[in-house]
UniProtKB/Swiss-Prot annotation:
Coiled coil: none annotated. Residues 103-181 form the RRM domain. GO terms for biological process: cellular response to retinoic acid; cellular response to transforming growth factor beta stimulus; cellular response to tumor necrosis factor; mRNA splicing, via spliceosome; positive regulation of mRNA splicing, via spliceosome; regulation of RNA splicing. This is U1 small nuclear ribonucleoprotein 70 kDa.
Length: 448
């Protein structure tokens, strides 16, 4: 395509001119020739010293030997200083040590932000405090992290010594001990090689990380050897964490238990309500069945009475004339009376003492003997209620007659009858051997 371009554009694509050749300024390395070549040292061996005449070499110390030497020199120098200061140290003549040493408590590992008033509030719970002395640095004026507390009574100091060790103040657990400088013979502070704990015995292999007072009296009640203080404190912290965790678990379990109890009570209430509803429905069904059973029983007794009257009605109907008129015939206990139909004066097919009548009597006696005690009690209660209502109704009629003089016309056609007539009307039997209906029930005639 470029060959079809015009010349002015083809000139833009033309190659550059080649670089002009210039001769090198010096020869190449392989072309150089040295005028003085290297040679050996054999001519100079006779000029060396004899190795047998040389002095022995001096041995220089290594880095490890130098560090060990400096450490040893430092320990020796520190021991000399401690011995010098120990000769001058007298705790009984210390101007900073004031008050009774047997009432003074030593508190270490105090937070640098803790004030004297805070210490007083924390340690006044064990007894009245006489004086608190917090130690500060003489050069910078900053707190050193320990203090001395003097109580008014020695028993309060012992109580604080026993119970305040390990107490957390401003986020740090303090160490509580007695003042040993003036109370323990031969006691030396830590700066003079004494003190408590094993954090400055030597290297990391012999030092312990946490230290505290060696109070073996706190472990007298426990069997076996007394544990180390820092391990005991760690165990106490772990025990506290476990107790707090158990308390939280118990609280959660209590909340779940209360929730379960509420759900259980709700389910129990629903269950009781359903059971009561079922019982009510069962009671209704039972009452309905009982009413239907009573109705069937009344119908059965009515049929039996009719059958008795129909079967044994020939014995006593001859003299009555069959029609009856105004007299009300009372059936006898044996069931003899005027039959409902048939000519008067005729006896039954077998007579009053036939085998059919005797069989009916046996069946009736058997049915009566098989009646349950509950039915008899119900019948007696019903009869008693009827008698009571009948007596109340009779007394009300008597009062009405006494007030109205017999002319009020409220006796429904019975005002012409006397008390005997009304009683006879109330006691009259029906045509089927039952008393007159009252309150919807047919009463069976009482046996004479």
């Amino acid at each position: 395509m470029t060959q079809f371009l015009p010349p002015n554009l083809l000139a833009l694509f033309a190659p550059r001119d080649p670089i002009p050749y210039l001769p090198p300024l010096e020869k190449l390395p392989h072309e150089k020739h040295h005028n003085q070549p290297y040679c050996g040292i054999a001519p100079y061996i006779r000029e060396f010293e004899d190795p047998r005449d040389a002095p022995p070499p001096t041995r220089a110390e290594t880095r490890e030997e130098r560090m060990e030497r400096k450490r040893r020199e430092k320990i020796e120098r520190r021991q000399q200083e401690v011995e010098t200061e120990l000769k001058m140290w007298d705790p009984h003549n210390d101007p900073n040590a004031q008050g009774d040493a047997f009432k003074t408590l030593f508190v270490a590992r105090v937070n640098y932000d803790t004030t004297e008033s805070k210490l007083r509030r924390e340690f006044e719970v064990y007894g009245p405090i006489k004086r608190i002395h917090m130690v500060y640095s003489k050069r910078s004026g900053k707190p050193r992290g320990y203090a001395f507390i003097e109580y008014e009574h020695e028993r309060d100091m012992h109580s604080a010594y026993k119970h305040a060790d390990g107490k957390k103040i401003d986020g740090r657990r303090v160490l509580v001990d007695v003042e040993r400088g003036r109370t323990v013979k031969g006691w030396r502070p830590r700066r003079l090689g004494g003190g408590l704990g094993g954090t400055r015995r030597g290297g990391a292999d012999v030092n312990i990380r946490h230290s505290g007072r060696d109070d073996t009296s706190r472990y007298d009640e426990r069997p076996g050897p007394s544990p180390l203080p820092h391990r005991d404190r760690d165990r106490d912290r772990e025990r506290e964490r476990r107790e707090r965790s158990r308390e939280r678990d118990k609280e959660r379990e209590r909340r779940r238990s209360r929730s379960r109890d509420r759900r259980r009570r709700s389910r129990s209430r629903d269950k009781d309500e359903r059971r009561r509803s079922r019982e009510r429905s069962k009671d209704k069904d039972r009452d309905r069945k009982r009413r239907s059973s009573r109705s069937r029983e009344r119908a059965r007794r009515e049929r039996e009475r009719k059958e008795e009257l129909r079967g044994g009605g020939g014995g006593g109907g001859g003299g009555s004339g069959g029609g009856g008129g105004g007299d009300m015939a009372e059936p006898s206990e044996a069931g003899d009376g005027a039959p409902d139909d048939g000519p008067p004066g005729e006896l039954g097919p077998e007579g009053p003492d036939g085998p059919e009548e005797k069989g009916r009597d046996r069946d009736r006696e058997r049915r009566r003997s098989h009646r349950s005690e509950r039915e008899r009690r119900r019948d007696r209660d019903r009869d008693r209620d009827r008698e009571h209502k009948r007596g109340e109704r009779g007394s009300e009629r008597g009062r009405d007659e006494a007030r109205g003089g017999g002319g009020s016309g409220q006796d429904n056609g019975l005002e012409g009858l006397g008390s005997d007539g009304r009683d006879m009307y109330m006691e009259a039997e029906g045509g089927d051997g039952y008393m007159a209906p009252e309150n919807g029930y047919l009463m069976e005639a009482a046996p004479e």
